[in-house]
Amino acid sequence: MKAADVRALSADQLKDELAKLKKEQFNLRFQKATGQLEKSSRINEVRKDIARVKTIARQKAAEAKA
């Protein structure tokens, strides 16, 4: 997910997206542990997407306070 796409989301949508990504990350870790994971690079992609969502959510919260 690109940063521009994330910036277009509202605060509630960001929370939903973050929850979805964390669930996906959990499932990927579980697949890795059981040897069923096909694309190991997806773990890093999801981790970076989570960071993107958290960063933009924090920026939006700071803008709202200012």
Curated annotation (Swiss-Prot):
SUPFAM superfamilies to which the protein is assigned, alphabetical: Ribosomal protein L29 (L29p) (SSF46561)
Entry coiled-coil feature ranges: none
GO molecular function: structural constituent of ribosome
A single Gene Ontology CC term: cytosolic large ribosomal subunit
Keyword annotations of the record: Ribonucleoprotein, Ribosomal protein
Biological processes, Gene Ontology terms: translation
Matching PANTHER family: 60S RIBOSOMAL PROTEIN L35/50S RIBOSOMAL PROTEIN L29, LARGE RIBOSOMAL SUBUNIT PROTEIN UL29C
HAMAP family in the cross-refs: Ribosomal_uL29
Listed name of the protein: Large ribosomal subunit protein uL29
Gene source species: Rhizobium rhizogenes (strain K84 / ATCC BAA-868) (Agrobacterium radiobacter)
